[in-house]
Structures are given as C-alpha cells and as structure tokens.
C-alpha cells in the first residue's frame, strides 16, 4: 500500500460516522430512532453538500435541533455546547432546572426540578455519547477553539448553535453570539480556510435548508467586525427559514445553471 493510500485509509477510518461515536451510543441512537419522534428532515442543498472539516451554523429549535442532527447526519460531527452540560450530573441538573427549563422554556421552577430528576441523568448520558465540545463565556473559550481545531484537522465537522437563547427559542432568530467567527478566524490564521455552511432546520415543514458554503477567506475580505459577520450570517439563516418552495426551486435551478 502506497503512503498516499495509507493516509487516505486512515483519514476515512477517523472520519467514519461509526468510528466517530462509541458502540453503546450508536445502539442508544438506534433505540431513539425506533421511537420515531425525531424524524429525518428533507435536506435541501442550495450549493455543495457538506464536506469534512467544515463549520456548520444552525438554529437550535430547543432540544429538537441537536437531537435531529445527531440522529440523521451521516457526516462525522462534533457539537458545541455549554460547559454546564459537560461538567457532571450536579452541574447539568442545576443548568437544566434554572436556565433551560425555567428561564428559556418558562416552566414553573418546581415542575422543572421534579422533571429534571429523571430528565437530567438521561440527558447527561446522551451528552456523554456526543463527545461535546464545551463552550465558555470567559477566557476558557480558548479551550473550545483548541479542541475544535483538532476536530477539524481530524476531518470532523463542527456544528454550532450560536443564537442567543436567553429569552427562549424563536423561529425568527434574534441574534448570534460571535464566538464561531472567532473560531473561523483563528483557523484561518493557522492555515485552515474553513468552509462555513449556514443552515436552518424547519421543524414544521420537515426541511433542513443548507446554504451554499462560503469560505472564511471570502468573509474576511468584507472587512467587517466579528459581530457584523455574525449578524450577516444570522440574517442569512433567517432568510433560509422563510424561503418559499418557489424560491427554493429557483435557487436550485440557478445552481444547476452555474454548474453547466
């Protein structure tokens, strides 16, 4: 076997969706699929399909987004997620009761505490299987970037849900945190020109809109701040969510013409 073929074989093994998750977790996901609660959405690509080592931006849709993408994405992926959900059972229970269910989903605090006695252990099990990349709101964010770059170099794609959900989850996204822009910028400085896919998961329509990828180098030419770039991609994400069937058909037709 030549050196090139050996490297290609090793890369394929590293990037295999089956190798990206442990055996017990793959079995756990099969069980969840049998429940048929998180159905596979129809993926609508307005450009190239997902490629390895890319950055994927998506709306959150509460727990529906991460669960659906994990169950039905064939690409080897890593998710960004708040460190509280990756720091043990006690930390996760506190976060889910006080922040997720009470503040974001507006549950009664006592109901949230009772529900999370059952929900949190199951959620922690799922998050452990995800091999989540922890995110932070302080200087520890450097760890997030470092681990994410290592994942990209292994051929894994990183999925980020950057919306500000402090007031809850909305179909029309209100703002994006700019941490993912900083990540793409750092990759670029280290010689990695990240392909960035803006996507929108439409639960009601059962569609997953995937915009044509744009490399970070193209965004850098715009001379915008991180916040401005995040807002620009936020607007595009919302546009994807509002596209009519006619607009989708037109976009796909234009893509075909460009290829020709």
Each predicted region: which residue ranges?
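N-terminal membrane-anchoring alpha-helices
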Residues: 1-38
């Amino acid at each position: 076997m030549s050196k090139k073929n050996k490297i290609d074989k090793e890369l394929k093994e590293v990037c295999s969706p089956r190798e990206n998750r442990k055996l017990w977790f793959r079995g756990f996901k099969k069980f969840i699929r049998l429940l048929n609660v998180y159905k596979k959405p129809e993926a609508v690509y307005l450009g190239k399909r997902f490629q390895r080592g890319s950055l994927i931006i998506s709306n959150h849709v509460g727990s529906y987004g991460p669960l659906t993408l994990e169950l039905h994405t064939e690409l080897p992926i890593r998710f960004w997620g708040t460190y509280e959900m990756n720091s043990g059972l006690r930390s996760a229970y506190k976060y889910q009761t006080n922040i997720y269910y009470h503040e974001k989903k507006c549950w009664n605090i006592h109901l949230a505490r009772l529900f999370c006695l059952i929900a949190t252990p199951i959620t922690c099990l799922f998050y452990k299987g995800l091999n989540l990349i922890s995110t932070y709101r302080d200087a520890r964010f450097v760890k997030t970037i470092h681990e994410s770059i290592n994942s990209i170099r292994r051929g894994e794609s990183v999925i980020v849900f950057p919306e500000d959900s402090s007031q809850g989850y909305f179909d029309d996204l209100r703002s994006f945190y700019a941490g993912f822009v900083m990540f793409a910028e750092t990759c670029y400085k280290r010689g990695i020109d990240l392909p960035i896919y803006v996507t929108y998961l439409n639960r009601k329509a059962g569609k997953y809109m995937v915009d044509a990828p744009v490399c970070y180098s193209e965004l850098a030419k715009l001379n915008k701040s991180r916040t401005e770039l995040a807002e620009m991609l936020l607007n595009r994400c919302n546009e994807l969510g509002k596209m009519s069937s006619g607009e989708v058909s037109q976009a796909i037709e234009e893509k075909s013409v460009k290829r020709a």
